[in-house]
Amino acid sequence: MNGQWYKHLIGARTIKTGIAIFLTAVFCMALDLTPIYAILTAVVTIEPTAKASLIKGYRRLPATVIGAGFAVLFTYLFGDQSPFTYALSATFTILFCTKLKLQVGTNVAVLTSLAMIPGIHDAYIFNFLSRTLTAIIGLVTSGLINFMVFPPKYYGQVEEKLSKTDALMYKLFYNRCQEIILSRLQSDKSEKAYKNIFNLNNQVETLISYQRDELSYHKKKECDWKLLNQLTKRAYTNRLFITHLSNIIYLPKNTRVNFSGDEKMALLKISSSIKDIFYDGSFKREDDSVETLRSTIKALEISGENQIKSHILYEVLMIYRLLDSRYA
């Protein structure tokens, strides 16, 4: 534990940003160029994955050129002491970046445009070319650093968040079944807990997409792909679980559903077996309880009555089936 403290203090992306800034400044100073514009570009180009850096860098370069071009143009027309120069440079840079679908580079383009205005004076062409060159230096340097230094590994984060998602899902499912048994079909507490789980699972899927991008850009062993596929399958199952869970949380208002004693006991046993997965590490089948709920659903389908009750029991059985397959 003590040997891992630094990972909580500074991350690989922070280190890569520092290295990119240092090398960018070195290259610019060696060429007698002002490094600040290149550094601005380098900072925003460090992305979670090498693929993202390359794709966004490809769009940030023309955006930066556009910003530098408008800075030179409006400085030539109004001078560097006019408010119009700053306002029009920023406005037209944003407008053109949006029209050309270069929004990802808008921020750095506007910053570059506004920052270079005071230093242009009469050297219009030189400043335009030098700012373009420094932008290229910043983009290339940060892109290479992001690709070569500390390639991101999100496996640990994904597994940690998946375990947390599992625990929260199972707990919420158990609590929601208790509410249903007690006829508390509207629950702000369950809705809030569901939203938290939903957002957490979105984070998992984002990290998995990052890791997949990294594997596609680096030569990795087959075991890396195998592990990623396992995590992806687990996240997909969680997504299905969450979807079915939402269907028993968000129910029509003023809904009334009555359950028999056997049905309540079946719901209790199934929800308890799912909740205990996190503590026991295994899934205890409740075949008799499942059969009880199936029989109820069939009876409701024949009579055509109480569709909400049938809907709730169906979703419970779908969740049970998902976990039965996972722990088969």
UniProtKB/Swiss-Prot annotation:
Chain ranges passing through the membrane: 19-39, 61-81, 108-128, 132-152
Cellular compartment(s) = Cell membrane
The source's superkingdom equals Bacteria
Asked whether the UniProt record includes rRNA processing among its keywords, one would answer no
User: Gene Ontology cellular component?
Assistant: plasma membrane
Keyword Chloroplast applies? no
Q: Which residues form the signal peptide?
A: none
Q: What is its main location?
A: membrane
Q: Which UniProt keywords apply?
A: Cell membrane, Membrane, Transmembrane, Transmembrane helix
- Give the membrane topology: Multi-pass membrane protein
Family, according to the entry, reads as follows: Belongs to the UPF0421 family.
Identify this protein by name.
UPF0421 protein SAR1980
Taxonomy of origin reads: Bacteria, Bacillati, Bacillota, Bacilli, Bacillales
